[in-house]
Amino acid sequence: MATAPYNYSYIFKYIIIGDMGVGKSCLLHQFTEKKFMADCPHTIGVEFGTRIIEVSGQKIKLQIWDTAGQERFRAVTRSYYRGAAGALMVYDITRRSTYNHLSSWLTDARNLTNPNTVIILIGNKADLEAQRDVTYEEAKQFAEENGLLFLEASAKTGENVEDAFLEAAKKIYQNIQDGSLDLNAAESGVQHKPSAPQGGRLTSEPQPQREGCGC
């Protein structure tokens, strides 16, 4: 039997959501490139990144869709929620308005993804402690009340960026193992052992507009 030309067993689709300027694209760039881009133009539409990680001995390719935070792009970016296995919902710990808008982002995520989508709340810019406008405790309480994973991170220093993507992947993989995530479901957001480079559900999305590393 021919061996599939892949060095991973699963593909997980992620989306990154949240207000404009919270650092979504900077988190993605830090995770995929191990670099911080200080001056990122805002994302126009959707951007895309990938990286292979390991969870419980399994190689997993993350396909990550970074969505624009501006209201005028919401209709476009909502189409990318479909079939997401994981969602990273980001706010800026120094801007309370971005935290106050989380309920709206969460409503979209709940309504447009499958019931088993793993959502992790990320308080970005943890390196700016002196400018903090949202406490760790209140964000943690919001996460607990809504059944979300939670951590604070810094796209600038790299603090907890790796953990944000990995913790979501661990939970998704756990859901696969315990049977709560049906890999045969069209909206699972997971592919197991793909057999062709462009085959399957996860690469059927429209091509994103790539306009630099927007925050």
Swiss-Prot record:
Keyword line: Acetylation, Cytoplasmic vesicle, Endosome, Golgi apparatus, GTP-binding, Hydrolase, Lipoprotein, Membrane, Methylation, Nucleotide-binding, Prenylation, Protein transport, Transport
Compartment list: Recycling endosome; Early endosome membrane; Golgi apparatus membrane; Golgi apparatus, trans-Golgi network membrane
GO molecular function, one term: GTPase activity
UniProt region (Disordered), positions on chain: 188-215
Stored PROSITE patterns: RAB (PS51419)
Renumbered ranges of motif Switch 2: 68-77
UniProt similarity note: Belongs to the small GTPase superfamily. Rab family.
Assembly description: Interacts with ZFYVE20. Interacts with KIF16B. Interacts (GTP-bound form) with RUFY1; the interaction recruits RUFY1 onto endosomal membranes. Interacts (GTP-bound form) with RAB11FIP1 (via its C-terminus); the interactions doesn't mediate RAB11FIP1 rectruitment to membranes. Interacts with RAB11FIP2.
Domain of life: Eukaryota
Reactions performed catalytically: GTP + H2O = GDP + phosphate + H(+)
Positions of modified residues (Cysteine methyl ester): 215
Source lineage: Eukaryota, Metazoa, Chordata, Craniata, Vertebrata
Sequence motif Switch 1, residues: 42-47
One record GO biological process: regulation of embryonic development
Membrane topology: Lipid-anchor
Xref: InterPro entries: P-loop_NTPase, Rab14, Rab_GTPases_membrane_traffic, Small_GTP-bd, Small_GTPase
Disulfide bond annotation, renumbered to this chain: none
Annotated phenotype, changing residue 70 to L: Constitutively active mutant (GTP-bound form). Interacts with RUFY1
Primary enzyme class: hydrolase
GO cellular component, one term: extracellular exosome
Described purpose of this protein according to its UniProt entry: The small GTPases Rab are key regulators of intracellular membrane trafficking, from the formation of transport vesicles to their fusion with membranes. Rabs cycle between an inactive GDP-bound form and an active GTP-bound form that is able to recruit to membranes different set of downstream effectors directly responsible for vesicle formation, movement, tethering and fusion. Involved in membrane trafficking between the Golgi complex and endosomes during early embryonic development.
Binding site for GTP: 21-26, 38-40, 42-43, 69, 124-125, 127, 155-156
Modified residues (N-acetylalanine): 2
Residues linked to a lipid group, S-geranylgeranyl cysteine type: 213, 215
Stated regulation of activity: Regulated by guanine nucleotide exchange factors (GEFs) including DENND6A and DENND6B which promote the exchange of bound GDP for free GTP. Regulated by GTPase activating proteins (GAPs) which increase the GTP hydrolysis activity. Inhibited by GDP dissociation inhibitors (GDIs) which prevent Rab-GDP dissociation.
Protein name from the UniProt record: Ras-related protein Rab-14
EC number: 3.6.5.2
Organism the protein comes from: Homo sapiens
